[in-house]
Amino acid sequence: MITFVIALNTFREAVRDKILYVLVAFGVLLILGSKAIGYVSFGQDYKIMADLGLTAIWMFSGMVSIFVGTGLIYKEIDKRTIYTILSKPAERWQFLLGKYFGLALTTLVNMVFLSIAFLTYMWLSGAPVTIALFEALFLTFIEMLVVTAVAIFFSSASTPILSAIFTTIIFFFGQLTKWIVDLATVLQGSVNGAAAKERARYIGGLLYKVYLVLPNLHNFNIRQDAVHADPGEWIRMNEMLPVTLYGLSYAAAVLLAAHLIFSRRNF
């Protein structure tokens, strides 16, 4: 119950943040402008619209998670309202979980609004609204749950500016996990010369460790496949459950780490 109250208050606080409306407005403008860009590509206008629409929803939802989420806990500390919250029968894990669910709800509402605008615009333009688009949107939301957890983690341990920087770095390199593991494999097996091979193996091993720590956000990116899918075609039906479970598990692990750090802070 306490977690629910904190989540609801967090959502109310987030929707009053002006940056949320700025990001949503830019997202809608990019979606509406996608058709004009699509006219430049002969015969590819619907695909361009779908690609830009999905990318806009992904990008601006990520920005909401990062720029709103990284300041949530710091604001409570700065305004000293955290003392009131934690002096009541509220555990620190309930506070963190409430903040997470509140931000996740904010991200969901943002995504639903942008998705309705995107799909309605596609339909009114005569473009096919395929099942694959809904698959891509669902996995984008699961990705945002991971990014939100990372934002809460850094917010529990650092200032908003540093939290935003670190979360953005994770968000960026999380998209490159496939490239990182491929590079690590190449470095560990295809370099000639003893000294060079040793250095390559060390760098490759280091990259592989980075790969294991980073969230594999590449798993959630099926936007290109969704754009080129036929109406009625499921493109990742067999992978939806394991990818979803991976995202939820990673988010849970990050929140646990955030709790371990936050529980040791003195207020």
Where are these regions (language model features)?
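Alpha-helical transmembrane segments of integral membrane proteins, especially early/N-terminal helices
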Residues: R16-L30, L103-L105
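Central hydrophobic cores of alpha-helical transmembrane segments
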Residues: L23-V28, L162-G174
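Short cytoplasmic-facing helical segments at TM-TM junctions of multi-pass membrane proteins
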Residues: T81-I85
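Short cytosolic juxtamembrane segments of multi-pass membrane proteins
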Residues: S263-F267
